[in-house]
Amino acid sequence: QANDLDYASLPDSVVEQVRTNGQLALEGDKGELGEQAILSLAQALDTYIPTPERAVTALDTMPSAVGYQPTLAEEMGVLQERYLADTANKGDLSNIPFGTVNLLAYNNYQAYLTMLGKTTDVTGNCELPEGVEMVMPGDNIKNPGVTKYLPTTSYSLPHVNVGTIGHVDHGKTTLTAALTRYLADLVDDAELLELVEMEVRDLLSTYDFPGDDTPIIIGSARVSAAASELAVQLKMAVVHDDTNPTSAAQTNAPWGLARLSSYWGLTLHLPNLTEEQGVTIDEDHPLFIYLPCGIGGAPGGAAYGLKNVFLGSSAGTTREVEHSDKPLHDISYAYLGDARQNWVMTAQTTQAIRLEPSATAGFAGPEFIVNSNQGR
């Protein structure tokens, strides 16, 4: 780890390293890797970044952001627009790192690219290119072929990343849960829950959200998952459908997606589904696929399968893109500004297909997909 820090020009001599085991800590272990390590980690954070001082009494209404969490772009900060791939001429692959976006500069069509960038903190300042006064999420950039768009962001608050070894989702969530267990006070008095709800509503109203009208359901997901009764889940579902009638749960959808075991299987089964339902997929009738949050590498798997199904070609390779890969005249990208997302975008420039991944935290990247037995 010290060598890695030196390679990245980070101060290994002053970086505090705390060995922990989040699972042991959650199980109540009092040893060096359990509770003691979690408390040492919190102390190290406070010592390394003394300002702003960590709030120990403030009401925390949402989990802390630990590590890479692309879905927080819509929850915690300001979306900036950013495009990382350099312009590439046809056949020129020498300067393109393997796995990043490789788009050809076609001149006979106009591409409308909607690109969402990385998250800035709530006090971040977005520096725009010359001549641009304002950028809003969802702005369209009209340009033939490849677009390079590079506003930068300055941060006024320090950022802390808590790194883990192993599976990024399991590691960071387990460690976050362990930190919460030992550093948060349990509200186990039913009468205090009413006060907590009042504070939450006041906080929502402070930021111009409808605090008085927002439905709040008190429950424990862990307890509900282990219980035979589904009262909390059912109550949440009813409140959601009543509050958002236009996006109510689909109870009679025609496509039997539940019978599929994976998103890769979904892409292989799509031709049969479209034929059964009499659905046409072409430039005038594009296919939109929305993937829910928390599915890890599914966006990459779905994109990989879609390219094989509809184009008969492999995604994530360095071969020159064929003319059959020519994108639609109007393509929308849900862009998160990450190298792994860049590779997903390569697979998304397919005929009449729009893939909108909302979470890729567990995606292992192009090298894993192309070079591993699991990926193949």
Curated annotation (Swiss-Prot):
This is PCM7-4. It comes from Bacillus velezensis. The lineage of its organism: Bacteria, Bacillati, Bacillota, Bacilli, Bacillales. Has antibacterial activity against Listeria monocytogenes. PANTHER family: ELONGATION FACTOR TU, MITOCHONDRIAL (PTHR43721:SF22), ELONGATION FACTOR TU-RELATED (PTHR43721). GO terms for biological process: alpha-amino acid metabolic process; defense response to bacterium. It holds the Pfam family GTP_EFTU. Keywords: Antibiotic, Antimicrobial. One of its GO terms (molecular function) is GTP binding.
